[in-house]
């Protein structure tokens, strides 16, 4: 589902499994040149990442961007805290979400859009174990139905 001029670099598939995502936002990231080069090579891990609101600004924590190989002294700490760029209205909306009990800001996807590194930030509530099991059972039954339909259509031909 990549839009025109958009190249996906990292996807957090586990986020939809662990969280019930209610809304998503597109945010820019404040990066150093060597970090951008490393991200373009796909050397970013957002699985353990999360975002926090501090002083009406949003910061991305625990996202690992591997050091750029030719970066030498210009490389920064791979796990440093990075500021996210959003409009004030979006930040206010996110503050409203996070003040409600149980809501978390989760990085969903990192992609290039017209040469700029963007982050899709999801707002979600953590799923309980029984919710995860229910989702897995639903997906499994859908897979079985599709398999049966495929076999029936092959038999008709």
From Swiss-Prot:
GO cellular component: cytosol
Annotated gene: smpB
Keyword flag Transmembrane helix: no
Name recorded for this polypeptide: SsrA-binding protein
Matching NCBIfam families: PRK05422.1 (NF003843), smpB (TIGR00086)
Region Disordered, residue ranges: 130-157
Disulfide bond residue pairs: none
Cellular compartments annotated: Cytoplasm
Function (record text): Required for rescue of stalled ribosomes mediated by trans-translation. Binds to transfer-messenger RNA (tmRNA), required for stable association of tmRNA with ribosomes. tmRNA and SmpB together mimic tRNA shape, replacing the anticodon stem-loop with SmpB. tmRNA is encoded by the ssrA gene; the 2 termini fold to resemble tRNA(Ala) and it encodes a 'tag peptide', a short internal open reading frame. During trans-translation Ala-aminoacylated tmRNA acts like a tRNA, entering the A-site of stalled ribosomes, displacing the stalled mRNA.
């Amino acid at each position: 589902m990549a839009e025109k001029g958009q190249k996906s670099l990292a996807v957090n598939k586990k986020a939809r499994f662990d969280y019930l995502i209610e809304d998503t936002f597109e945010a820019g990231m404040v990066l150093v040149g060597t970090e951008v080069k490393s991200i373009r090579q796909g050397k970013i891990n957002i699985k353990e990442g999360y975002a926090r609101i501090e002083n009406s600004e949003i910061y991305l924590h625990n996202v690992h961007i591997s050091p750029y190989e030719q970066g030498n002294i210009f490389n920064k700490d791979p796990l440093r805290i990075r500021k996210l760029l959003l409009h004030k209205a979006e930040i206010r909306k996110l503050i409203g979400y996070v003040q409600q009990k149980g809501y978390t800001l989760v990085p969903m996807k990192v992609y290039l859009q017209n040469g700029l590194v963007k982050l899709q930030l999801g707002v979600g509530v953590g799923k309980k174990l029984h919710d995860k099991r229910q989702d897995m059972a639903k997906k499994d039954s859908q897979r079985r139905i599709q398999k049966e339909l495929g076999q029936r259509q092959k038999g008709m031909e």
